[in-house]
Amino acid sequence: MKLSVFYLRRMGRALMHGKYTVCLGGMTVLLVFSLAFSTLEQSFLNTNLDLDGKTILTALLIAVLSLAVTSPAQVGVRSLFGDIANQREAKLAHVFQWYGDGKRLNRSIVLMLLQSLLFLAAAVVFFGLVFGGAYAIHPEWFAGLTSNNIFAVADALTTVYTLALVALVPTYLVVVPFLPAPYLLAEDPEKKPLVCLRESRRAIRGFYWKYVGLQLLSFLQVIAYAFLASIVAVLFSGGDIT
């Protein structure tokens, strides 16, 4: 039976009934960890503008520490989602189980590291092709980045952001088959990370574009909520949206 993306979303909302609190709790844990390390790394880079060897090494260590701390939470949240989808008892404590078991901790870190390396490899290829091709065709597009004219800089930055978006789309589409891997590890912690990646690629066959569609709808929903929240914030602050 073929199920539309919209029907799958309705099924998901039905399964979430009465479990929003535990789900939001798991997402909050992951968000707090992610924001904490992101803020730490950004603050460090802002106070160390000289990119010498020591600065780069420290930034890499912060990134590695971030991966080690957030990876178990990422797989743990998927475990929580799996409990909800399979109508099992869902508890926030299930997220922290991945920190208390050495084997789970290790495998979650290795899996998320492999996913990050796959994304990085795809990004290097596509960003290199897009930006290299753009520079070969029209080098003047990037000349404005070093200009003293603010309008030239703004125009060049717009070009850079547009090219980055163009490169990001194929990068994402290439790594899509490996995105469900954390769910597979969450369902069976005894699986090795490489096995999860291989099985993820096989499992998504025939459902590739449906998976992309689900993620796209979720992304658009987040943007819509953010837009509405910004309008409400402006109105409550006494601003005029017109």
Predicted regions and their residues:
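Hydrophobic alpha-helical membrane segments
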Residues: 1-242
